[in-house]
Amino acid sequence: MSWKTEPGVVRYGYPLCLLSLSCLSGAHAEEYSAADRARARPDSALVLEDVTVSARRREEPAQTVPIAMNVLAGEQLNDAGIYRTEELQQRVPSLLVSVPSPRYTSYGIRGLGSSSYNDGIDGSVGVFLDGVYLGRQGMSLVDLIDIERVEVLRGPQGTLYGKNTTAGAINLSSRAPTFAPEGSGEVSVGEKGLRQYRGTFSGALIDGVLAGRLTGYDVERDGLIDNRYDGSELRDQNRQGLRGQLLWTPSETFSARLIGEYAWQDEQSNVFTASHYSQTTLERSAFVGYRQLPIDPYARRVQQDKPNAVKTLQTGATLELNWLLDSGATLTSISGYRDWSYDASQDGDGMALAIVDDATVRLDQHQFSQELRLADSPNQHLDYVVGLYYLRQHLNRAVGVRFGEDAAAYFLGDRPEIEQFHITPAMIPSSLLEGGQQSFDGEQRSDSRAAFGQLTWHATERLAITPGLRYTRERKQAWLSRSVSGLAPLGLDLVSQLGGNLLRSTALGGEYYRRDAIEESSLSGQLALSYAFDDDLLGYASWSRGYKAGGINLDVVGPTVEPTFEAERVSSLEVGLKSAFWSGRGMLDLALYQADVEDYQALTNRPPVNEFAPPIRDNLINVGKVRLRGIELDARLRASERVDLRLGIAWSDARYRDFANAPCSPSSAQWSCDLGGKRLFNAPEWSASAGVDYRYPLEHALELFSGLDYQFRSGYYGTLEGGPGSYQPSYGLTNLRLGLRRGDRRWEAELWARNLFDEDYITAVYARLGAGDYGVLSGAPRSVGMTLRTRW
């Protein structure tokens, strides 16, 4: 896409372009040659940089692609202090990332995301690292170091990206090795003992034939949560990683790129501050003489007698091969193998009581993927890409829960018989549950095969038509077991024995085993039409169909709960505009969409098995229909050589159309509710991102720079049932940076403040031990620090 001057915009100035859509229209009747355009912009410093993307599996300018997307270059990530994938939402209003823990990481785009805490459900946003799909969303929690660019594609992307992209896809592309020597180093220090080190070096190993690149990072920070039980600090940071690459170019028609990765994390995380206590919890706590902390979701304090240690280890290898064939077509092979392990030992009750003495979770994910693609532009009217895809995944899971000496008295503390017969905690034998061990073991294997193709027919110089299809065949098989051990004989009288056995059965369950399998096929596709009204204005309309795989419920379920669930399918209609104005100094994109979701996957309640047990949310089924509607606006403007402005706004109306068996708020005393017409959880109505960057040149080739970023989200519920304490109020965050650097950015010294005004906010909600109890993950407080960077 090229740029031309629009007299009306120049006359009235850039503020109107951000406040009115009129800058998108106008009669661009005069056609300029390349030389004319060069004369029209004598100062290239005033022109926004061109952005190249690979969203359609080929390199092309972002403004010519009929897909709603956000693109962030690696330098933009560094400037904004975006170091982790979950921080991308600072610049992408339609993206919401919830990270209660790596195991339960959830990405949502336009209000649609993963709907439950269950190892058997897949994500709705596909995350791809150097072309390799990451099978579990917790695998995507990587440090964004040495990144070429990040592409966030909004809306279903099933044709080229496959299953589990019903809400969108995130492409992470690392920088490739270079033959010219280059490198960078970065040191950051800040409050709470923050120490962050990042470094990269690249260069030729065999001149013109073999190049290498090595990247590493080390991050440490003290905890943000005060544990009132022993004075320790929780929710710290401690992670390290390495990425090594080789690029082999033995000829002009062949290249091979090998990437090896290692990432380690060992932190006291997965810690939640209480936001609501149910009446049951208050009665039980009072019975055993335990004083709960006052409700204050922003206090960043807990009271628990066990650590929350979470360790993850991820290793991976990617091999990308590219052949330029005699016909001019390019054949690409991407092979990927990844291992990911999650090992958690945590306080299962969130209190300083010996209710759950030990709670452990061990997950091991192994996956292999292979993609073959053939891409070509045989003539000026046709571009195409066709391919084959294979993905194999293997998940092992081991979960253990051991009850402590306070468990029996606590769980019986709200029974009416306690007061009726004047029972005290000392009268309840701890042996009823103490030492009882639940072990949940399981395994899931899945295989996915697909064939796909997409072509773009340039019917005229301005009109392009892009159809695409993908056929996917999916098979999953799994087994799950529960065993109970560690219980001593009760040795009680007959009546007490019966009551004790009932309590044990309710709290621990019995032996359990099941094996399930599913096999399904799906046809995804799209049809897009784009029209270039002139060189600066592209309009498009598209229909797309996405697919999220069905699966197997990897929780223990009762006889009334289906062990498997069907695939979730999304049909989306979208119209949009992509424009440039003011001789290339500004860009403004607009998208309007509606998506209809069929067989929406969610967890619902099953009725209680007896009067001791509350409703259990383990019924993972297809509940009905969801509709998403919204408008998105993205704008960038180079106001002068010194000032850049940006603005992103997203309005989303995400609602259940049909959800009759939804879990109710625990305070309602109902087992199921009809949520038809209600808003989805984790789906704020309004989201926005805005920012300004300022540069001021000094003598001796130096430059002062500053940046201000603002992010806003309106309030929304963080859980499906919307219980008291699960609402996340609206908030706005401001980040500021000030610094000095060389004009060529060979070195930089920067002072920064994140969450400048120390705003209280919530990033995730979690259902705690008791029905109706909620904990929240509060956002980080204000943090001030300094970063030094050098490049060569």
Report each predicted region and the residues it spans.
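Solvent-exposed loop segments that connect transmembrane elements
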Residues: I225-E233, N270-Q303, D347-D358, G400-D441, ...
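Outer-membrane beta-barrel translocator/receptor signature
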Residues: D122-S124, R136, I145-R154, T159-R228, ...
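Gram-negative outer-membrane beta-barrel transporters
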Residues: Y384-V385, E461-I465, Q594-D596, I621-L720, ...
